[in-house]
Amino acid sequence: MISNVINQIDAIAQNTGDLIAYDELGRTHTYAQLKSGSDSLAAHIDSLNLPTGAPIMVYGGQQFEMIASFLGSTKSGHAYIPVDKSSADERLTDILEIGKPALVIAVDELPIEITSVPVIDPKALTSIFDNETSYQITHPVEGDDNFYIIFTSGTTGKPKGVQISHRNLISFADWMLSDDFNWPEKSQVLSQPPYSFDLSVMDWAPALLSSSTLKALPKETADDFKTLFATLPKLDLNIWVSTPSFADVALLDPNFTQENLPQLTHFLFCGEVLTSTTAQKLLSRFPNATVYNTYGPTEATVAVSGLPITEAVIATNDKMPIGYVKSDTTIKIQDPDGQDVPAGETGEIVICGPSVSKGYLNNPEKTAQAFKQIDGHQAYKTGDLATMDSSGLLHYRGRSDFQIKLHGFRIELEEVAQQLQQSHFVAQAAAVPRYDDEGKVKQLLAVIVASDNSFEKPMQLTNAIKDELKDIMMPYMVPGRFIYREAMPLTPNGKIDLKGLIAEVNGDA
């Protein structure tokens, strides 16, 4: 059991300081350097006399200095707000306005001028890290203090800052390092999701708490397929953490196999639906690896349920289940009135437990809408639909806000995409609606990245896909039009950009 995140990482630095904590394509830093840098930064932050507990924004990409800044902030008693360097200027401005940070640490050069709060620019930050300082931790983030605040994109309007406490983080990290995942110590762990996406916590937290090495994959490398495919085998990975969409990109390379990545033993997925197609490809190509599907919203600290996906699971489930809830947490499946539904019936996932956030920063109205108390414990209403069978296994049924109605039929977009991917002609798929002038759905479209094939015309490929799926898909779920692309657009978080595709097909992009 972890009692204190900061102390445990520092203890590794004191006992085995020469271990590599961070490897950014050969630019390495040890645990001793992580402690030294974060200590020096914490001492500097203390000297600024910032308001007690006020958050600190940390801006940058996949760099060691980001992690060191996170730890330096929390050692000095301040939560950090991670902001990725690929963020739009407007998002940066929104986060400054809503989050009200007392300080901005710029690991990379800021794209806008910030005058409302003090800024530590990259040059000054380097000087602080180089100025080794002995630091005594006396007022760190602990207990219910916020450890980090991650801003979600939100379905509409301004982003919301999800507050995650030290206690929330420990609940998650303890689970990741439990027997449920058999996370080996001193592993080589892929660090690909941006730190502004809470999936990144699934790599850095258990890695740094288990004497492991984070193998950073900068966005520039991940976005260039040729460079990505050449880089992955050189990382000597043991543990892979990403969205399923990023794994689908890697699977486009026929050399992404156990033979070329022999030490890879764990795939951990979260953030979007894992299809049976993707899971089967991974099991076939990596026979020595275990594929874990996990589920959870940012508001409940990354993930709260999971299970290993085996051949037996694939054979007995049309869609990949999202697992069993972790032992310190309760999941209820409820109707719109907040009443529990019978086992096997669809309802909203409501999460109750020690990893549930206290709410949205400086946004009591949205907090009151999404959070509630159940038997004296904090609970979060996810907006995700699921069923729970008699064994406690959760089966995801989609987002309540990604359902459409076409010709009187209710259609779940993610379900259509999953069924499309069962065709061996389809590498990746998304289903998107086209609306008429009155906002009513008039057509369902499929956006496809095709597998290698010998068809000369798109119509031949479309007919072949439809023929393969005619016994799987209900006729009303078959898209009326198929659009083919070389690659799917992804959000900065590595998920398929479904909202962007919807805007594109409706002429709003």
Regions found by a protein language model. Give the residues of each.
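AMP-binding/adenylate-forming domain of the ANL superfamily
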Residues: M1-I149, I164, T275-A279, S327-T330, ...
